[in-house]
Every structure is written in structure tokens, then in C-alpha cells.
């Protein structure tokens, strides 16, 4: 199992639109990047002042590339009149290629690239479209874009589809496989607590599971954290920072976790499951199911009084900004129907 770590000091939760700064020459972050599963996270390294210094240096022949006082080259792109820093590179053409990748993601059909003879294949286009702008910027800044692209291509079969096979059983009432993939080894499950899905924006991993399945390379890395990729049953990749907190002596998933909680509508008592592929890539997977543990088929929908009553609707129906369950919704529908009956 591989792993990847990135200095936490380069990470913030701000916008991706940041202004680069003068920094002393240093080695590429690739050398310090460990990988666990297929890890990554959004890293925002705000640097200020490079633009002023760059004006004193010869300009680049490439679009979106600026010279650095230390002899290296920076790449940048503008989004809504704000500059997005794409990273620093040893070679001018490396920075130009990073700009080309970003402009494809930001401008799509309107992209004007430096290397017009280089055409993206369908796999790369799909890869770009399946990741947010901030995720692509993150990969470029950490010089992991090419590696993650190749990993994505290896997970595809000859038809260009993800090579995953759902289990024929084990579907939760959210329509999601709790174990994920037939070729995957189930690692462990955890019922999330109120604090796991609350404002702390972190998931505590039980210590014995953390040390067995997600061992950190060293104490130094434990503090900085490693970057993990988990793929869900829909093929979406979730990026979490995983580290050890000395203050609470616990292993936690932090950055990226709150987005997962929000999208999957997790509540206290719901169960998240983790598994790993048996293949050479050791891909990590994440699944989830509601606390009810119902074995209802997600495709089975009861239609009553013109309303679809299903597990999904029970979790998402909102009336007057208040979430209601199936029973409450049915009561509302019946009362409305009764009023209409008497009126006629």
C-alpha cells in the first residue's frame, strides 16, 4: 500500500483563487509525496509578490507562464478576473503544459492552449470532467496530475468504462453497496456519531482499524497527515486528509469529510464502510447506508395519493424548511386529500 503526505502548512480552506508569493528555491514536492490507496487533497499555497518580481524578468513565450526570481517557472490562469496559481515548475514547458491542463478544465471548448498539436484523448477529458476545478489545481500544484490520470486510465477497461462490478447483494436502503466491489476486501464499518457528522468536520477512525488498515509511515507524517482517495460505488473519487491528532490521541479524516457528509446526507447512526481492492493498485473504496438497516430495494417505490414514498424521499423531503419522514409526509398528504374531498 502506497501513501502520500503533504506539509499541512501549505494547506488552507480558502478559495482556489490565490496570489503567488516569492519563496526560496526548493525541491519539487513530488519527492516528499507519499501515497496511501490513491491519495490527494486540495492544497492551497498562497504566495504573494511574485507578479511584481516577474515583471522585472524576461517574459515567457507561453501563455499562462511567468518566470520566477529563483530561475523556475510559475503557471497561472485567470478565473472571473482573479488569478489562480497553478504551481511552480523547474522547466518552462512543464509550466506551459500545466496551464494547458487547467485551461481545458476551466474553459472547456473555448480553451486556447500552448501546445495545439497535443490533443487530449477521451480518457483524459473524462478525468478532467469528473474532478472539480479546485481538485485539478491541487494535482497540478503538487505535481501529481499525471500519476492520478494514469491511475484513472488503469481502472478503465477496453470500453472506456470503470472496471468495477457491483455485488448482487448487500445493497442498503440508499441503493449503495455496503461493501462496494466484488473484487474488494471489506476492511471495517463504523456507525457515525453526532460529532462525526457535526461541525467538527472530521471522522474519527477506531484506533485498531486505523493502525491495521491505514498505518502512517512515520511519526512526522502522522502530524502532517497523508492524503487518501476513496472511490464510491458510483465511481466518484473522494479526497480526505488522514492524520493522527496528538491532542485527542485519535486517527481522523478531516479535509473533504464534511463535503461527503453533506452530499450523502449522513446522520448520526448511519454506517460508513471501507474496503480495498484486491488488485495491484490497492484502490480504497467507501460505502454508506442509513441507520435503519432496511433491505428495501432502492428501485422499489410506493406511489400513494400521487406521491412517491421511498427511502430516498424519507431522507430528503422538506416542508416549510423542516425535514419530515414518510409517516409525517403521508399524514400531510392524507389531510390535504381530505380537505379536497370535503370541498367537492
Swiss-Prot record:
Induction: Down-regulated by brassinosteroid and zeatin. One of its GO terms (biological process) is negative regulation of flower development. Residues 1-15 have a biased composition (Low complexity). Residues 1-22, 148-169 are annotated as: Disordered. Residues 61-116, 188-292 bind DNA. Keywords: DNA-binding, Ethylene signaling pathway, Nucleus, Transcription, Transcription regulation. It comes from the Eukaryota. Its main location: nucleus. Expressed in all tissues examined: Roots, rosette leaves, cauline leaves, inflorescence stems, flowers and siliques. Highest expression in roots and rosette leaves. Very low expression in flowers. The keyword Lipid metabolism does not apply. CDD domains: AP2 (cd00018), B3_DNA (cd10017). Signal peptide: none annotated. Transmembrane segments: none annotated. One of its GO terms (cellular component) is nucleus. It is found in: Nucleus. The keyword Nucleus applies. Monomer. Belongs to the AP2/ERF transcription factor family. RAV subfamily. Contains two distinct DNA-binding domains. One is located in the N-terminal region and binds to the 5'-CAACA-3' motif. The second is located in the C-terminal region and binds to the 5'-CACCTG-3' motif. Binds specifically to bipartite recognition sequences composed of two unrelated motifs, 5'-CAACA-3' and 5'-CACCTG-3'. May function as negative regulator of plant growth and development. This is AP2/ERF and B3 domain-containing transcription factor RAV1.
Amino acid at each position: 500500500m502506497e501513501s502520500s503526505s503533504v506539509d499541512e502548512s501549505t494547506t488552507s480552506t480558502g478559495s482556489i483563487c490565490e496570489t503567488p508569493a516569492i519563496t526560496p528555491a526548493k525541491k519539487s514536492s513530488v519527492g516528499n509525496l507519499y501515497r496511501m490507496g490513491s491519495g490527494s487533497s486540495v492544497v492551497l499555497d498562497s504566495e504573494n509578490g511574485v507578479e511584481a518580481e516577474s515583471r522585472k524578468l524576461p517574459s515567457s513565450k507561453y501563455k499562462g507562464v511567468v518566470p520566477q526570481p529563483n530561475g523556475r517557472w510559475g503557471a497561472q490562469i485567470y478565473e472571473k478576473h482573479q488569478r489562480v496559481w497553478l504551481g511552480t515548475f523547474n522547466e518552462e514547458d512543464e509550466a506551459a503544459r500545466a496551464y494547458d491542463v487547467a485551461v481545458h478544465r476551466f474553459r472547456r471548448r473555448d480553451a486556447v492552449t500552448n501546445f495545439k498539436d497535443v490533443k487530449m484523448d477521451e480518457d483524459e477529458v473524462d478525468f478532467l470532467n469528473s474532478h472539480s476545478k479546485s481538485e485539478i489545481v491541487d494535482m497540478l500544484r503538487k505535481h501529481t496530475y499525471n500519476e492520478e490520470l494514469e491511475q484513472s486510465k488503469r481502472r478503465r477497461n477496453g470500453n472506456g468504462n470503470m472496471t468495477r462490478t457491483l455485488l448482487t447483494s448487500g445493497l442498503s436502503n440508499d441503493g449503495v453497496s455496503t461493501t462496494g466491489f466484488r473484487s474488494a476486501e471489506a476492511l471495517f464499518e463504523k456507525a457515525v456519531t453526532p460529532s462525526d457528522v457535526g461541525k467538527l468536520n472530521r471522522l474519527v477512525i477506531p484506533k485498531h482499524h486505523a493502525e491495521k488498515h491505514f498505518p502512517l509511515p512515520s511519526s512526522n507524517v502522522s502530524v502532517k497527515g497523508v492524503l487518501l482517495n476513496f472511490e464510491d460505488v458510483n465511481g466518484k473519487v473522494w479526497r480526505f486528509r488522514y492524520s493522527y491528532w496528538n491532542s485527542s490521541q485519535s486517527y481522523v479524516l478531516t479535509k473533504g469529510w464534511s463535503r461527503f457528509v453533506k452530499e450523502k446526507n449522513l446522520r448520526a447512526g448511519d454506517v460508513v464502510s471501507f474496503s480495498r481492492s484486491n488488485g495491484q493498485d490497492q484502490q480504497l473504496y467507501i460505502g454508506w447506508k442509513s441507520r435503519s438497516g432496511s433491505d428495501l430495494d432502492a428501485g422499489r417505490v410506493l406511489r400513494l395519493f400521487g406521491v412517491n414514498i421511498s427511502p430516498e424521499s424519507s431522507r430528503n423531503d422538506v416542508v416549510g424548511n423542516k425535514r419530515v419522514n414518510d409517516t409525517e409526509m403521508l399524514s400531510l398528504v392524507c389531510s390535504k386529500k381530505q380537505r379536497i374531498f370535503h370541498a367537492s
